[in-house]
Amino acid sequence: IWGSWLISLGAYLGGGLDFTGLQIGSFFATMGIASLFMPAVMGIIADRWIPAQKLLGICHLISGAFLVAAASQTAYAPLYSCMLLSVMFYMPTIALSNSVAYNALDLAKLDTVKHFPPIRVWGTVGFIAAMWFVDLTHIGGIQIKLTAWQLYVSAFLSFVLAVYSFSLPGCSVDRNVKSQSWIDTLGLRAFALFKEKRMAVFFIFSMLLGAALQITNAFGDTYIQNFGSMPQYADSAIVKHSVILLSLSQMSETFCILLIPFFLRRFGIKKVMLISMLAWVLRFGFFGIGNPGSGAAFLILSMVVYGVAFDFFNISGSLFVEKETSREIRSSAQGVFMIMTNGFGAFFGSYAAGAVVDAWGWPDSWYIFAGYALVVAVVFAFVFKYKHNPAEMASVNH
């Protein structure tokens, strides 16, 4: 669903619709707006009233409907509005999917640290398949990735997954709220995690690093497509099949997911997150150095390090939250993690990135992004206090 448009939408907006960098950034900031409250609200509903697997299907149905509406729009305001509404119902599905997967592993009495990453790999495989499809498929002689057809493809997949979601193992809900406080009833207990200094610092840096998550999604394809206007790169295979090149990032992600259990047990969450932050520095830096000609190797290296940059933060962070929280607030806690990363982080990061691109252009913008990631890494190393206990990560079987 996401792979059909997340990587290629920026190039369509900038090239096909001639939107500015700030406008392009605003579309990716919709994920931030939605994540500020929708994952937490849906997490509360999943914990208290509607089983997570059913709520997952409902969200995909509604999100797909708004994607269909968005595909027919070309003006900024209506297109932005439809995408915002679609994303509002899509973003909660990430945390809900995690909860449904953890529940299935729990029912099977399997170790989440060991068995969740291999399951999560298939989400990345689907993402890659969708990217290749929109890059290689032409309608009217034009690649889908350069047109609104990418949104129709995503909508179709949303409807398919909605139907499938209803067949997944049932998740429990707690409807017995008579003896609970209103905080428990609303699922707000997860926000009490901010009272714990270590968790508060973890969530704050999740927000700071979350600002980097959507930058290459928004502008990676746009940047590579810009090389097509230069005579020496006009016929470059990298420019023509930029989305396939970018899919190397997801291939790297597929491999790196499998490394998470080892790295978490060996090094702990702090070092794993530091590795992720430094990988983001390289991700942006290599983009700035690279080009479709003599600098092609740097573009490829940027794709290779993406797996470490994304997985070592996103997946490991989710598992860390899973380990640190109780069953009663687990879905809500995953929602809070989403708020900080894909909420505040993505919102401010996407708008800031769009402003930087409009002001500084290419390739200087990449160096600014790399510098930001480096500063966050250095501060995190000194501020986040965590003593790794390998036994804690040896088994997470709730």
Language model: regions and residue ranges:
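Central cavity-lining transmembrane alpha-helices of secondary-active solute carriers
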Residues: 26-44, 244-259
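Helix-to-loop junctions at the C-terminal end of transmembrane segments
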Residues: 37-51, 138-139, 255-269, 357-358
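C-terminal ends and interior cores of transmembrane alpha-helices
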Residues: 61-75, 278-292
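Hydrophobic core of transmembrane alpha-helices in multi-pass small-molecule transporters
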Residues: 63-66, 76-96, 207-208, 297-312
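Cytoplasmic helix-loop-helix junction between adjacent transmembrane helices
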Residues: 84-122
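Juxtamembrane intracellular "pre-TM" segments in multi-pass secondary transporters
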Residues: 168-204, 229-234, 398
